[in-house]
């Protein structure tokens, strides 16, 4: 299993770094004001709900779930289009998929939004697409859940089921869409890249891709469109020319905004160019808050789509909670993935983790929702900070042996009270100089993270 990562390459220029330093200076000197949010970046109006929600569910689910070797199996195991269609997609029948149950678990875990894979790299559309070029290799059948698999006989629409369940639960709904399509006649997977049939095929494919995206927006009205599969370049192989460019990414972003002006779109319309509305580091956390909105997407067991071999490799609940807090302390969002099995049922491991996080969020959710990142430049040795209005939340992961927690004093403000967030019990403290020294209970209430609220006047 891969360990937690706290570094990443951002590709930002010096102007963005300067902006980050200026915003941090405002936080440290109290210029942001005690009654307003002070993010490390500007939050557009259409993204305020997203920035406040902080925590979402990612769902990787497709024909690869039936195979149980992960969503990249077609590529990693060298399976041809025809073989994949006949031996995997044609047998995919998720009759036990229960949108209400999945959304219920998301809500109880404290998740505020959800993103579902409408189409992953293997190309099977999880909705009843009408775009004619997306077929199997015979050209006779539309390659979709409804028209190609045994599940089609049910006349069910699992994306709409999820959409409706989210709406009932008050959870925001989003969709994932892969730019590359290993099944489409215009493309063939070759190693980690995708070979293009011709430049004429490229033009036709992009038009058809946009037609599918219009179907998704018109039918399901997603609030987020989460793109992926924007890599198509291999320098040492001229047959794998870079057929998806920055200009294509800009055009795709504008197209999505033309379909729905307030839709939130991630950077992977074409990554590394600062496009889209937010950055999305994958299974990694940046060392510092970024200069624009960002979201870490994370697996529970190092697998996105259902992978049998990873079912005994789940992280523990404590790890996942501390990951969430690490992200929130840096002003980011946390998109945590589940990969249902081929029949549509949730795995036991994902249920356990979601329940565990939910138990913690029931006590400490106020220290996550609607918060901004730490107002202090230095990380404490005992945990992390988040902030909301005039309250600094100390996330204590390492309990002080002498029962004295030393926290930084916020911007010369006067402390009003200090209390345990889980029950409101007041704690004794001594505010002196640049420190607030808090008398802690003898025993740590929560092993993963106990939150102490320091309220300022």
Language model features with spans:
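Low-complexity intrinsically disordered segments
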Residues: 4-7, 33
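Bacterial N-terminal signal peptides that target proteins for export
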Residues: 6-22
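Sec-dependent signal peptide cleavage junction
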Residues: 29-40
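Mature catalytic domains of secreted/periplasmic carbohydrate-active enzymes
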Residues: 41-457
